[in-house]
Amino acid sequence: MTTNRLVLSGTVCKVPIRKVSPAGIPHCQFVLEHRSQQQEAGLSRQAWCRMPVIASGQLLQVLTHSITVGSRLTVSGFISCHQGRNGLNKLVLHAEQIELIDSGD
């Protein structure tokens, strides 16, 4: 199987970290908090998660430049496992597309 696709909407809950790799590729890392009501087995349940997101490359940097804590986004991309400094593995969403959700203000 080769399908690896995730679409998640939420609110940026940690200050974005912007870096440039030694190869000159810009990266923006942030955490997206998702909260929703979902249906499962005919019952309503609360869904909640915090997903680390990394957006790489020049095209996405134009979009991520305006992202701050509290920004509402829909992010689509693929997930991959990253090992943290503490040695624990975590899932990370590698953004391929980012859409700002209009707050209606």
Swiss-Prot record:
Q: Which GO terms describe its molecular function?
A: single-stranded DNA binding
Give the residue range of the signal peptide.
none
Keyword annotations from UniProtKB, A to Z: DNA replication, DNA-binding, Primosome
SSB domain residues are 1-102
Any GO BP annotation: DNA replication, synthesis of primer
Gene Ontology cellular component annotations, sorted alphabetically: primosome complex
Q: Does the keyword DNA-binding apply?
A: yes
Question: What SUPFAM superfamilies does the database record attribute to this sequence?
Answer: Nucleic acid-binding proteins
Q: Which domain of life is it from?
A: Bacteria
Q: What is this protein called?
A: Replication restart protein PriB
